[in-house]
Swiss-Prot record:
This is L-arabinose isomerase. CDD domains: L-arabinose_isomerase (cd03557). Its EC number is 5.3.1.4. Its cofactor is Mn(2+). It comes from Shigella boydii serotype 18 (strain CDC 3083-94 / BS512). GO terms for cellular component: cytosol. It catalyses: beta-L-arabinopyranose = L-ribulose.
Amino acid sequence: MTIFDNYEVWFVIGSQHLYGPETLRQVTQHAEHVVNALNTEAKLPCKLVLKPLGTTPDEITAICRDANYDDRCAGLVVWLHTFSPAKMWINGLTMLNKPLLQFHTQFNAALPWDSIDMDFMNLNQTAHGGREFGFIGARMRQQHAVVTGHWQDKQAHERIGSWMRQAVSKQDTRHLKVCRFGDNMREVAVTDGDKVAAQIKFGFSVNTWAVGDLVQVVNSISDGDVNALVDEYESCYTMTPATQIHGEKRQNVLEAARIELGMKRFLEQGGFHAFTTTFEDLHGLKQLPGLAVQRLMQQGYGFAGEGDWKTAALLRIMKVMSTGLQGGTSFMEDYTYHFEKGNDLVLGSHMLEVCPSIAVEEKPILDVQHLGIGGKDDPARLIFNTQTGPAIVASLIDLGDRYRLLVNCIDTVKTPHSLLKLPVANALWKAQPDLPTASEAWILAGGAHHTVFSHALNLNDMRQFAEMHDIEITVIDNDTRLPAFKDALRWNEVYYGFRR
């Protein structure tokens, strides 16, 4: 069972009574056939549910109203099978607060050249019925997604499935609670921001809990539960000599397991699916949570360090979007550079907290080593390299009057040398179009040093995310040129200024 099993997408057919009952009967039959086929053959992430035909303003308004109040409904897919006068949709679309996709398709793929007549033409009017629907969306300044293609086309299936992932993630985000253990890292700007504005825009709430509250739960974990979890560690990871039974750091592993169990219990009891920590606020914890955070991220929790609630929420959102896809998604930080003519590289990592979902090793190394930050006992962590191939890094920032999503397309590469003295998980990549352009553009756009790294998602996914939430997106990829990029930032400033 995945998170998508908790949601459904409604399939709505637009028509009218002008064409008579026989035409509407055929429309209904076509709709049933298409929905059944899509649910069976299209490998969609969640179920399509066919709703009654929308043939009058009252029927359409009722469908939209019901969609708003049904928590299982993640969005609407609308098919204008015949011509459906768009004034009938105004009241419904005015109140609709769920994502909307217009499926611009028709029942038949090929025209029946020898038998086509006006009955066929009146029944299959997507070509101009869809344009009428598009006009009212533009007139109402309501942007919605559009997918054109036959309902048996695999590319159409993939695009609808991708949109469904966005719709489910948006609905899930409305219920997302972010827990901050402690506050923001002192004097850091980009990790701070307006939590009220974020809840208005995205729906997730952000609140702070004292680390002492967490410590109480951690200390309540039984030794039996700790030992059972460490047994799981033994089977899942390659334990270094220091972490094995009778090893000099074995107690640190036991303590890391206790922290993991305590954190998970705290998050489950509070209904949290994203959280932050900060090494400046660890009172009562024996070590900075490293292994615990890594494993919780792998289970789908959002996380970011230093109180960075925006990145923690974004990671959770992207975890939901990428559920079931190939490749992992993790908290990340651009840490240091390798400058070499024609081969500039970025080494990404964090103090401890990189998600094992992006690991290339089947069994990462579990080790305990010194950490000079935080002033606590040496923390346990998983150490691994990252899968190679195309990926993205994304950052969500608060500009005061709006949110900006930055996305850099990257290519992860194999680490050319063993990092024998680097005791943390890491990723190595080439930034597109090149490191000077990418880093300068990122800095000019105000991108954070914390990001979400993903092999599972791509630029199109993040474009859909930005469009669905009506936020600015700034893209850095192989097509980026700095003069045009700077112009786009200026134009966006004017555009969003007019929308205030």
